[in-house]
């Protein structure tokens, strides 16, 4: 049975939720599931915007047929070829061999690589600035390279001001029938998942996102239809402002993310003392995590959110504790920058981790200010925090 939502007089959401998938891209936990959004326009010609993941293909196809009500499907626009949005292309074309597929040249190359065969006579290749008229609706095509794949584009309905934004403005989380942003408490229930989605999936490509936002600023956008998460039909400035923060790597809030690596609880105890001292000084926006038991996607999200980081780690085989090193490597890979960082190191002998973390941050990441006064403990903290000044490239032993 179809499960659809009418967005406007002639535009329908025909996507589906997936609550069974545990890991998005087989790496990021999604305890609230995820939606795969697809949209169907009923004009003089019928137009389907993107498809859906194979896991929800049956529901997706039922939705499409339920809205078409026997009409043929004239066009399929593919904005993004990643399989969670393109895996059902062949199933659509098997049921609707009359359909012409509209996308860009690189997208058709990727479709062929993935095995989504579209015959040449059934292709319309578009580029930046091209338009296609389907009746009263005219769609313009805008390139969005590296947001977050090279072939990505967005489609803009010049008639209604609807932006089909591909993976931009998306979020983790199943919709559960509530399609629009004003049908949910976005700040409370969706913002963290939207941030975690952006920072871990798109975060590396901030400059490309800013290019797309620059193009979008020239459009009179009335509604945003992303491929994941809620549809934005009001307060669009809110999500655009969030994207500007994330894409420019500016923190959303003044606060401290305190991440610790502790084998026997001693480094954790030191981190707890620091958190208490910060609270006494009036900094109560503190968020403390064990790097060994917290999925990195949550740490990355909060690293983008807050202005200050504290990294507290034991020395491990004369190096950085592996889970902490993974976190550092992820921050580097996702291009995090413009943060103030404090360091706590622990070692019972040959305590090298503080200097190694400092060296990593200063040599591999942009605009990271590492405080020169670090904290060294030997095995466990006694008598208060010990400060080591002017370290470079390693901490002094005390």
Regions found by a protein language model. Give the residues of each.
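Conserved beta-strand hairpin/beta-sheet module of binuclear metal-dependent hydrolase folds
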Residues: 4-65, 154-157, 162-165, 267
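Metallo-beta-lactamase
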Residues: 5-9, 102-152, 205-211
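Active-site metal-binding motif and surrounding structural segment of the metallo-beta-lactamase
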Residues: 44, 55-102
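Structural motif
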Residues: 45-47, 75, 137, 161-164, ...
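Active-site neighborhood of phospho(di)ester-bond hydrolases with catalytic His/Asp-centered motifs
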Residues: 49-51, 73-81, 101-104, 163-167, ...
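Active-site-proximal loop/helix segment associated with metal-binding centers of metalloenzymes
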Residues: 148-152, 160, 168-203, 247-252
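FMN-binding flavodoxin-like domain, especially the glycine-rich phosphate-binding loop
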Residues: 175, 186-224, 229-231, 273-289, ...
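Short N-terminal or domain-adjacent regulatory/targeting segments
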Residues: 225-252, 326
């Amino acid at each position: 049975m179809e499960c659809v939502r009418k967005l406007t007089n002639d535009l329908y959401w025909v996507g589906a939720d997936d609550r069974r998938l545990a890991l998005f891209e087989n790496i990021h936990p999604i305890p609230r599931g995820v939606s795969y959004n697809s949209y169907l326009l009923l004009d003089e010609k019928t137009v389907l915007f993107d498809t859906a993941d194979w896991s929800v293909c049956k529901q997706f196809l039922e939705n499409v047929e339920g809205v078409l009500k026997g009409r043929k499907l004239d066009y399929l626009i593919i904005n993004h070829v990643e399989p969670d949005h393109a895996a059902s292309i062949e199933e659509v074309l098997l049921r609707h061999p009359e359909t012409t597929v509209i996308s860009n040249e690189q997208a058709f190359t990727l479709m062929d690589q993935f095995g989504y065969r579209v015959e040449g006579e059934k292709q319309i290749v578009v580029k930046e600035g091209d338009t296609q008229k389907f009746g009263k609706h005219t769609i313009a095509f805008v390139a969005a390279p590296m947001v977050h794949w090279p072939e990505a584009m967005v489609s803009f309905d010049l008639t209604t001001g609807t932006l089909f934004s591909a993976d931009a403005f998306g979020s983790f989380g199943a919709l559960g029938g509530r399609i629009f942003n004003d049908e949910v408490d976005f700040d409370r229930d969706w913002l963290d998942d939207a941030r975690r989605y952006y920072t871990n999936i798109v975060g590396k490509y901030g400059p490309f996102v800013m290019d797309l936002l620059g193009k979008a600023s020239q459009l009179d956008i009335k509604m945003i239809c992303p491929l994941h998460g809620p549809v934005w039909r009001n307060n669009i400035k809110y999500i655009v402002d969030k994207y500007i923060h994330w894409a420019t790597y500016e923190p959303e809030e003044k606060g401290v993310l305190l991440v610790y690596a502790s084998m026997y609880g001693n480094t954790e105890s030191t981190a707890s003392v620091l958190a208490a001292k910060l609270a006494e000084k009036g900094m109560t926006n503190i968020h403390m995590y064990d790097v060994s038991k917290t999925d990195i996607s949550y740490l990355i999200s909060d690293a983008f959110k807050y202005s200050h980081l504290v990294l507290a780690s034991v020395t491990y085989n004369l190096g950085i504790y592996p889970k902490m090193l993974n976190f550092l490597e992820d921050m580097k890979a996702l291009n995090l920058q413009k943060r103030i960082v404090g360091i706590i190191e622990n070692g019972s002998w040959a305590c090298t981790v503080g200097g190694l973390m400092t060296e990593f941050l200063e040599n591999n990441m942009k605009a990271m200010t590492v405080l020169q006064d670090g904290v060294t403990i030997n095995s466990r903290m006694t008598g208060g925090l010990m400060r080591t000044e002017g370290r470079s490239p390693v901490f002094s032993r005390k």
